[in-house]
Amino acid sequence: MQESHFFAHLARMKLIQRWPLMRSVSSENVSEHSLQVAFVAHALALIKNKKFGGHINAERVAVLAMYHDSSEVLTGDLPTPVKYYNPEIAKEYKKIEAAAEQKLLSMLPEEFQEDFRPFVISQQTSEEEAQIVKQADSICAYLKCLEELSAGNHEFALAKKRLDITLAERKTPEMDYFLNTFAPSFELSLDEIS
């Protein structure tokens, strides 16, 4: 039996800090972020199915979201303003991410590679599934901004403005439902939500 470093690499997601250029009241790592994105993506899929006539596998979407940033164990977390500074950088970084996804997949025992391929290789995801994971990713960044701003950290004001635009561009009925139903609580204290 051959040794595999796949899960040892995934365990390092907790060592990669998000928002590396921002002063944060509460730090966030890629592992924590991925779990929150999985929660939100699962909810978006369920909302789409129950409220807006969707037919998407919510559990599959949750697992896709768990792995959506897994390549960062090999690439690190490049700040969004850098990643999307211009189309050429964004295009080249996508190539780097794709190579990292392939390398990560190749770490698995061969007999399991096809089972993990749909989750580790982002190009294997359907457009509808990818859209929900991207929406959840943006919502989680937005919720982080709300939390930081509520704690008096104005460092996140511009990031929130940018995310307001991103959310408007990706707007769907299920996103509106989620944001109207769940987002306001992120601006409240523990006493207020208890």
Curated annotation (Swiss-Prot):
Annotated site residues (Appears to be important in orienting the phosphate for catalysis) in this chain: 18
InterPro entries: HD/PDEase_dom, HD_domain, YfbR, YfbR/HDDC2
Cellular localisation: Cytoplasm
Binding site for substrate: 18-19, 33, 69, 77-80, 137
Documented EC number(s): 3.1.3.89
GO MF: 5'-deoxynucleotidase activity; metal ion binding; nucleotide binding
Residues the record lists as binding a divalent metal cation: 33, 68-69, 137
Record GO cellular component, one term: cytoplasm
Record-linked SUPFAM superfamilies: HD-domain/PDEase-like (SSF109604)
Catalyzed chemical reaction(s): a 2'-deoxyribonucleoside 5'-phosphate + H2O = a 2'-deoxyribonucleoside + phosphate
Cofactor: a divalent metal cation
HD domain sequence ranges: 30-142
One Pfam match: YfbR-like
Main localization (coarse): cytoplasm
Source superkingdom: Bacteria
Keywords of this entry: Cytoplasm, Hydrolase, Metal-binding, Nucleotide-binding
Function field: Catalyzes the strictly specific dephosphorylation of 2'-deoxyribonucleoside 5'-monophosphates.
UniProt family annotation: Belongs to the 5DNU family.
Quaternary structure and interacting proteins, as annotated: Homodimer.
Designated name of the protein: 5'-deoxynucleotidase VV1113
Species this chain originates from: Vibrio vulnificus (strain YJ016)
